C-alpha cells in the first residue's frame, strides 16, 4: 500500500510538471527571426522547449522567482533577455554562463537583495544592463562590472534600500553613454566613487535630499557631459565653496527634473552652476518654484552669472505664489548672452519690455502653451525688444487676431520664423503687416476657413494644415514648402501660383484624383505627400499611378497611404494593387460597339421585316387587337348574313347581276353582305369590314387579277386571314372568276394559300351549260 501511494504521488508530480511546461510553451510566441515574446503570460519558470535559434526573449511581468544554472544553458545565441517585474529572488552563480553573445539584460524591479559579480563575468558582449528597483543595499562585495568592457548603458539603485555607493562599485568602467543611479535614499558616498568613470555622456541621478549632492558633483565635473538631477528637494540647498582642483568642466548641459526649489536655493544653485566653466544649456522640467521671483539671496547679493549658458529651457514650471511673482528684474544682467529660451506650459502671459530689451543675443524664443494675448504681446515685443530674434514660437496661446499679431511683431526686424499654430483665429483679413524678413509661417490648427493676401509674399515655408480650407489660390512666388494636410481641398493647388515649390504635403483632404499633367506643371517639385485622400480609382488615374515608376520617388507615402474610395468593389484597397476590367476601362468604346451592333441588328430586322412583310403583320395584328377590344352590344355574336362578298369594283357587274340574282332570289334566299349596299355610312371602312366579316357565316372571295390589285380587297383578305387564325375555321370560300396563278396571292396570306393548296375552290366556267352546276356548288358551300 505505501509503495502504491508513493507511485501515485510521483506520477502526480510528473503530470503537474508536464502541464506547467505545456502552459509555459503556450504563453510564448516566436517569429522567424528568433524573437520570442512571453510578457504577462503567468509563467512560473523560464521555458525549456525553445531552440538555440532564439535571439530575443521577453519574459517580463510573469511569476518567475528562481533562475537555475540550466534554465538558459541552451540559448547560446541569445542577444536580448528581459526579465523585469517578475519577483526573481535567486539567480544561481552560473545561470548566464552560456550567454556570451548577450547584449541586452534587464533584471529591473525584482527581489534581488544581493548582486553577484559571477553573474556578469561571462557576458563579454553586454551593452545594456538594468538593475533598477531591486532591494539591494550596495552593489556587491566586489566590483560587478569590471569585466563588462562593452557596456554602454547602466541603470542601478532603488528608491528605498540602496544607501551606499563605494569606490569599487564602478571600477573598470571607462566609457558609458548613459548611467542612471537611483540614490533616492543614499546615506553614504565614498569620495571618488564615480570619478573612476572617465566619460559619461548622460548621467541621471535620483536623490530625494541634497545632503551628498556636492560631494557627488565634485567627482562628476570632469567626466559627465549631460547631468540630470531628478526628484530632489532643493528648498534648503546651500552652496559651499568646492575644492575640486579642476579648472575645466566637461558638463555642457544641466537638467533639473521634478525638483523643488525656492528663491534662495535657486540663488545657491546659480553659485553651483558658476563653477561649471563649460556649461551651455540649462533645463528645468516639471519643477516647483516656491518663491516670488526675488533671486538676490539672503544677503541681497547680486545673482551669480552662470557663465556661458546659451540655452535655457523651462517646461511645466509650477509656481504656487504665481500672482505674487516679481518682475524678474534681478535676472536682467544674466540674460544678455542667452541665445535660446523655451518657456513652455508655465502660465506665462507677459514678458516685461525691459527683460525683452536685455535679451540682446536671443535668436530663438518658444512660449508655447501659455497665456499670451495680443495686448500683452505688444508690451513684450516693444521697441528694441529681442533685437536678434529670428524664431518666435507662440503655439497654443490665446491669440485671436491675425492682423493684430502681425502688426505687433513689426518691431522684430530680424524675425524670419513664426509659429502661431493652435491659436484660434477663424477669420483672416485681406491684408496684414508682417516683419519684412519673414520666411516661415505656421498657421496650422487655427480654424481658419480661407486664405487671403494676408499671407506674406516673402514666405519660403507655409504650414496651414488642419484647418477648414476648401481652396488655395494664393500667389507665393518664393514658396518652397507647402504643408496643407487635413483640410477640405478637392484638387491640387495651381502650379503657376507656386513656381518655386519643392515640397507639397496635402494628405487627408478630399482630393479624388490628380493627373500627370498636374504633377508635370510643378516643374521644381521633389516631394509630394498626398495619401489619405478619397481617391476615385478610375482607369486614367490607375494607369497614371501604376505606370509612372518615377512617381514613387516623388510620393513619399506611396503606396501604403493611397487607398481607393470608389468604385465600391475596390474600396479600401491600395491604388497600386487595383486592377479594373476591360469593360470598366474602355466603357466608351464598349458602348460605341454595342450601339453599332444594335444599329446593325435593327437594320437587319428592318430588311427582314420588309422582305417578309413584318410591318404589315404588326399593323394587322394591332388593328385586329383594337377591334377585339371594342365593347360589344351583345354578349353573343349575331350572324346577320350568310356570306360577306369580297370583290373588286371592276368585277361588280358579275357580282351584282349574276351572283346576287342567283343567291338572293333563290328559295330559300341567301342574304349577302355587299360593301356598296350594306356598309354603314359614316363608319370607318376598316370597322365596316371587320363587323361585316364577323356578322357573316362565310366570306366569299371573288378572285381575279383585279382583286389582287385592289387595296381594299387586300384589307378584306387581311381580316379574313386573322379570323381564320382566331376562330380556327374554314369560313373562306374562294371563287376564281378568271384563271389566276396561286403565286399572284401575296406570301403573307399563308393561310389562304394553304387553303388553295389543300381544298378545292370554285372556278367560274365560261361554258353556260356548266354554270348551273357552279351555282349549286356555291350554295352548298355557303350552307356548310
UniProtKB/Swiss-Prot annotation:
Glycosylation sites recorded in the entry for this protein: 114, 199, 414, 442
Subcellular location(s) of the protein: Membrane; Cytoplasmic vesicle, Phagosome membrane; Membrane raft
In what way does this protein cross or attach to the membrane? Single-pass type I membrane protein
Q: Annotated site (Interaction with bacterial lipopeptide), which positions?
A: 349
Where's the Glycyl lysine isopeptide (Lys-Gly) (interchain with G-Cter in ubiquitin) crosslink? 754
Q: Which UniProt keywords apply?
A: Cytoplasmic vesicle, Disulfide bond, Glycoprotein, Immunity, Inflammatory response, Innate immunity, Isopeptide bond, Leucine-rich repeat, Membrane, NAD, Receptor, Repeat, Signal, Transmembrane, Transmembrane helix, Ubl conjugation
**Which cysteine pairs are covalently linked by disulfides here?**
30-36, 353-382, 432-454
Q: Which InterPro entries match?
A: Cys-rich_flank_reg_C, Leu-rich_rpt, Leu-rich_rpt_typical-subtyp, LRR_dom_sf, TIR_dom, Toll-like_receptor, Toll_tir_struct_dom_sf
- Pfam families of this UniProt entry? LRR_8, LRRCT, TIR
Family annotation (PANTHER family) = TOLL-LIKE RECEPTOR, TOLL-LIKE RECEPTOR 2
Regarding protein family, the annotation reads: Belongs to the Toll-like receptor family.
- Subunit and partners: Interacts with LY96, TLR1 and TLR6 (via extracellular domain). TLR2 seems to exist in heterodimers with either TLR1 or TLR6 before stimulation by the ligand. The heterodimers form bigger oligomers in response to their corresponding ligands as well as further heterotypic associations with other receptors such as CD14 and/or CD36. Binds MYD88 (via TIR domain). Interacts with TICAM1. Interacts with CNPY3. Interacts with ATG16L1. Interacts with PPP1R11. Interacts with TICAM2. Interacts with TIRAP.
Protein name as annotated: Toll-like receptor 2
Q: Which gene encodes it?
A: TLR2
Amino acid at each position: 500500500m505505501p509503495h502504491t501511494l508513493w507511485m501515485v504521488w510521483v506520477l502526480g508530480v510528473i503530470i503537474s510538471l508536464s502541464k506547467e511546461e505545456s502552459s509555459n510553451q503556450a504563453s510564448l510566441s516566436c517569429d522567424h527571426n528568433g524573437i520570442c515574446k512571453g510578457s504577462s503570460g503567468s509563467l512560473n519558470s523560464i521555458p525549456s522547449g525553445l531552440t538555440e535559434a532564439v535571439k530575443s526573449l521577453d519574459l517580463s511581468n510573469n511569476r518567475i522567482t528562481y533562475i537555475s544554472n540550466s534554465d538558459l544553458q541552451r540559448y547560446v545565441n541569445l542577444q536580448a533577455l528581459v526579465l523585469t517585474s517578475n519577483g526573481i529572488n535567486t539567480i544561481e552563480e552560473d545561470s548566464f554562463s552560456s550567454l556570451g553573445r548577450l547584449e541586452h539584460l534587464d533584471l529591473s524591479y525584482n527581489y534581488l537583495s544581493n548582486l553577484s559579480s559571477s553573474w556578469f563575468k561571462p557576458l563579454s558582449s553586454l551593452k545594456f544592463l538594468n538593475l533598477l528597483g531591486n532591494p539591494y543595499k550596495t552593489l556587491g562585495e566586489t566590483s560587478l562590472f569590471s569585466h563588462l568592457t562593452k557596456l554602454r548603458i547602466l541603470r542601478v539603485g532603488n528608491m528605498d534600500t540602496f544607501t551606499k555607493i563605494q569606490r569599487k562599485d564602478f571600477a573598470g568602467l571607462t566609457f558609458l553613454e548613459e548611467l542612471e543611479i537611483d540614490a533616492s535614499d543614499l546615506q553614504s558616498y565614498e569620495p571618488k566613487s564615480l570619478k573612476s568613470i572617465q566619460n559619461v555622456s548622460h548621467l541621471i541621478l535620483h536623490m530625494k535630499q541634497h545632503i551628498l549632492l556636492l560631494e557627488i558633483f565634485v567627482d562628476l565635473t570632469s567626466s559627465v557631459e549631460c547631468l540630470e538631477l531628478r526628484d530632489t528637494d532643493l528648498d534648503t540647498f546651500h552652496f559651499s565653496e568646492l575644492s575640486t582642483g579642476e579648472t575645466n568642466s566637461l558638463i555642457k548641459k544641466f537638467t533639473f527634473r521634478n525638483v523643488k526649489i525656492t528663491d534662495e536655493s535657486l540663488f545657491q544653485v546659480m553659485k553651483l552652476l558658476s563653477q561649471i566653466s563649460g556649461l551651455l544649456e540649462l533645463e528645468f522640467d516639471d519643477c516647483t518654484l516656491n518663491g516670488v521671483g526675488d533671486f538676490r539671496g539672503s544677503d541681497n547679493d547680486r545673482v551669480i552669472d552662470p557663465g556661458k549658458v546659451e540655452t535655457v529651457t523651462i517646461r511645466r514650471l509650477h509656481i504656487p505664489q504665481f500672482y505674487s511673482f516679481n518682475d524678474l528684474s534681478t535676472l536682467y544682467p544674466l540674460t544678455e548672452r542667452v541665445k535660446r529660451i523655451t518657456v513652455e506650459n508655465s502660465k506665462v502671459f507677459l514678458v516685461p519690455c525691459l527683460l525683452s530689451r536685455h535679451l540682446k543675443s536671443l535668436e530663438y524664443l518658444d512660449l508655447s502653451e501659455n497665456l499670451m494675448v495680443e495686448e500683452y504681446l505688444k508690451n513684450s515685443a516693444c521697441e528694441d525688444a529681442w533685437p536678434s530674434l529670428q524664431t518666435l514660437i507662440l503655439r497654443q496661446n490665446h491669440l485671436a487676431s491675425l492682423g493684430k499679431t502681425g502688426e505687433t511683431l513689426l518691431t522684430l526686424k530680424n524675425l524670419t520664423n513664426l509659429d502661431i499654430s493652435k491659436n484660434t483665429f477663424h477669420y483672416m483679413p485681406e491684408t496684414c503687416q508682417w516683419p519684412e524678413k519673414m520666411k516661415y509661417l505656421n498657421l496650422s490648427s487655427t480654424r481658419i476657413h480661407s486664405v487671403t493676401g494676408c499671407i506674406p509674399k516673402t514666405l519660403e515655408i507655409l504650414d496651414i494644415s488642419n484647418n477648414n480650407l476648401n481652396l488655395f489660390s494664393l500667389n507665393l512666388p518664393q514658396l518652397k514648402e507647402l504643408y496643407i494636410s487635413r483640410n477640405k481641398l478637392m484638387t491640387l493647388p495651381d502650379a503657376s501660383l507656386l513656381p518655386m515649390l519643392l515640397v507639397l504635403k496635402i494628405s487627408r483632404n478630399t482630393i479624388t484624383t490628380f493627373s500627370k499633367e498636374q504633377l508635370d506643371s510643378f516643374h521644381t517639385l521633389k516631394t509630394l505627400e498626398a495619401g489619405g485622400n478619397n481617391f476615385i480609382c478610375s482607369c486614367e488615374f490607375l494607369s497614371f499611378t501604376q505606370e509612372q515608376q518615377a512617381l514613387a520617388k516623388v510620393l513619399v507615402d506611396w503606396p501604403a497611404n493611397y487607398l481607393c474610395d470608389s468604385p465600391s468593389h475596390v474600396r479600401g484597397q491600395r491604388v497600386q494593387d487595383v486592377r479594373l476590367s476591360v469593360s470598366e476601362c474602355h466603357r466608351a468604346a464598349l458602348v460605341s460597339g454595342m450601339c453599332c451592333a444594335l444599329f446593325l441588328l435593327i437594320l437587319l430586322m428592318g430588311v427582314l421585316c420588309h422582305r417578309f412583310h413584318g410591318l404589315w403583320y404588326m399593323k394587322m395584328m394591332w388593328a385586329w387587337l383594337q377591334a377585339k377590344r371594342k365593347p360589344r352590344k351583345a354578349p353573343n355574336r349575331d350572324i346577320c348574313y350568310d356570306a360577306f362578298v369580297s370583290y373588286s369594283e371592276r368585277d361588280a357587274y358579275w357580282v351584282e347581276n349574276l351572283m346576287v340574282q342567283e343567291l338572293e332570289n333563290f328559295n330559300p334566299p341567301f342574304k349577302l353582305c355587299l360593301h356598296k349596299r350594306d356598309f354603314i355610312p359614316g363608319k370607318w371602312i376598316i370597322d365596316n369590314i371587320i363587323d361585316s366579316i364577323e356578322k357573316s357565316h362565310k366570306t366569299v372571295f371573288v378572285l381575279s387579277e383585279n382583286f389582287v390589285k385592289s387595296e381594299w380587297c387586300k384589307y378584306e383578305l387581311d381580316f379574313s386571314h386573322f379570323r381564320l387564325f382566331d376562330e380556327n375555321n374554314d369560313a373562306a370560300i374562294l371563287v376564281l372568276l378568271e384563271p389566276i396563278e396561286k403565286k399572284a396571292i401575296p406570301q403573307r396570306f399563308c393561310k389562304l394559300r394553304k387553303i388553295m393548296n389543300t381544298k378545292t375552290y370554285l372556278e367560274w366556267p365560261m361554258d353556260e351549260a356548266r354554270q348551273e352546276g357552279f351555282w349549286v356548288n356555291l350554295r352548298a358551300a355557303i350552307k356548310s
